[in-house]
């Protein structure tokens, strides 16, 4: 409100500057000095930070998206633990009793029925884990409903793109924040670590895959690109991928190229709040 420009200073830049000192020291005052020096030297590369309605909504989406990830990770850990317990109780029979051993129907069955000769300790442990699994299922569903509501309120429609479901769309919107921070698809690609970094010397021109950038955003674009070349993906992406392979690139390199194209599409959709149009050529 006072007319000041606020920028986001990644801690890694301050840390790198401190490590380059002859005698690296750390304190709050030195950190503040390091932040000021980074701003003076790299102001043209730092992203602006603005509190807009779009940024606030994106932050809410990010928090819900991360909450969902934590719950899904917990559910995965419980599944692995239950595998061991169910195998000890039913041997290999538990795998053929249900198509999905961890469906709601299966979980309720494991909780209600146990082998007569089973150890009481194992039964109690199994029931605790099954109860938590059922609770997690309900909590994840509630979070997904909230995410759907927030995505609808945001006005963004990137979930209409093939290979971009609810979870990927929520991750992208949450990590990008206000799309107006990024003046071009290239700046978004660099932020996400989807832009190649130059490693040239003399007449030799080389480009390598970037391992920096926002890793959650990078992973979301990677999963989106993988979906594009799956059997259920779209033909244009598959044709582009095959063309890159025919040009001499490895499949992993071709996938990196496709991921960069996904950034272009997502930037355009976020910038103009348009739905995905597979027939567009730009």
Model-identified regions with their sequence ranges:
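Short alpha-helix plus adjacent loop in nuclease-associated cores
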Residues: 7-50, 204-212, 229
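Glycine/alanine-rich phosphate-binding loops at beta-alpha junctions
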Residues: 1-6
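Short helix-capping/linker segments at secondary-structure and domain boundaries
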Residues: 42-47, 78-79, 137-141, 177-181, ...
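Short, charge-rich amphipathic alpha-helices with coiled-coil/heptad character
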Residues: 41-61, 112-115
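Glycine-rich, often acidic, oxyanion-interacting loops/wings at catalytic, nucleic-acid
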Residues: 59, 64-157
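Phosphate-backbone recognition surface of nucleic-acid-processing proteins
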Residues: 159-160, 166-251
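Acidic, carboxylate-rich catalytic segments that either coordinate divalent cations
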Residues: 232-282
């Amino acid at each position: 409100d006072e007319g000041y420009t606020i920028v986001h200073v990644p801690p890694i830049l301050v840390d790198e500057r401190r490590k380059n000192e002859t005698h690296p020291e750390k304190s709050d005052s030195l950190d503040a000095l390091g932040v000021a020096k980074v701003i003076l030297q790299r102001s043209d590369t730092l992203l602006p930070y603005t509190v807009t309605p779009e940024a606030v909504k994106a932050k809410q989406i990010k928090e819900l998206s991360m909450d969902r990830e934590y719950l899904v990770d917990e559910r995965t850990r419980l599944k692995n633990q239950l595998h061991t317990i169910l195998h000890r109780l039913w041997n290999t029979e538990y795998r053929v009793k249900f198509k999905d051993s961890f469906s709601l129907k299966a979980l309720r069955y494991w909780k209600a029925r146990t082998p007569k000769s089973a150890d009481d300790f194992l039964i109690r442990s199994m029931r605790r884990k099954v109860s938590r699994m059922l609770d997690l299922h309900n909590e994840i569903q509630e979070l997904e409903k909230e995410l759907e509501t927030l995505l609808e309120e945001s006005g963004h429609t990137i979930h209409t793109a093939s290979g971009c479901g609810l979870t990927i769309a929520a991750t992208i919107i949450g990590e990008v924040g206000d799309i107006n921070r990024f003046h071009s698809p290239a700046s978004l690609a660099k932020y996400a670590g989807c832009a190649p970094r130059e490693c040239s010397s003399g007449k030799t021109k080389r480009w390598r895959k970037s391992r920096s950038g926002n890793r959650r955003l990078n992973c979301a674009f990677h999963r989106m690109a993988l979906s594009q070349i799956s059997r259920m993906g779209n033909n244009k992406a598959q044709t582009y991928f095959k063309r890159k392979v025919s040009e001499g690139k490895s499949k992993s390199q071709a996938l990196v190229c496709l991921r960069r194209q996904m950034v272009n599409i997502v930037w355009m959709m976020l910038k103009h709040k348009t739905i995905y149009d597979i027939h567009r050529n730009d």
